[in-house]
Amino acid sequence: NPVTLDFLDGEHIAIVGPNGAGKSLLVDLLTGKYPLRDGVLTYDFRPSATQTAYDNIKYIAFRDTYGSADANYYYQQRWNAHDQEDAPLVRELLGEVKNEALRQQLFGLFRIEPMLDKKIILLSSGELRKFQLTKTLLTAPRILIMDNPFIGLDAATRELLFNVLEKLAQLASLQIVLVLSMLDDVPSFITHVVPVENGVVGEKMERAAYLRTFRERDAIRVEAD
């Protein structure tokens, strides 16, 4: 189905819908993974020094308790309790950081210093997500897309991540986009929600209006059942 959508400066977006609704396909379109058969995809990444989607849009897909489907999941699976000595330290994986001001800001926000000399396989689920966010944000993207950031977390770690993301949303140069399956996962810092269902991308709505509309709809469905 055709999609007309804009993400404006100052907005933090949640793309919400059930599994299989088409959320991942929408993200693929937004990031330019697939060429459009029709229409135009336009970016404005100012004040970034580069205008490429590769440099300015970073995507993290969380799959399970151990973080994600990409590099960090690989780290956790590659080393186990029998070969901990070969596992890298957080410090080594973060590498050299050229932007000292950004490093200090992110290390303070995510409390990275106490983790630097820990081995990657010994991080808790919450620590691993903070590590991955820090590593990604050290590249200074304009847009950070997180797919299922709360999956596999206990209540305390979920609350911690909520608080960290809320602080992250206050960074003037960063727009956050969350891809979520559950209505109740939409954090308070989210300004707008894009509902996706059965391959159809709905109209972007303000968060309060979305929650009101979809809770009423779900209540009607329950009564009908």
Residue ranges and their predicted role:
Residues L144-N148:
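Catalytic Walker B motif of ABC-type/P-loop ATPase nucleotide-binding domains
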Residues L133, L161:
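Hydrophobic anchor residue at the start of the ABC signature
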Residues K98-M115:
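Conserved ABC ATPase "signature" region
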Residues V27-N99:
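ABC ATPase nucleotide-binding domain signature region
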Residues M182-S188:
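Conserved H-loop
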Residues V196-E223:
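Conserved beta-strand-loop-alpha-helix hinge in the C-terminal portion
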Residues K119-L123:
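Conserved ABC ATPase signature
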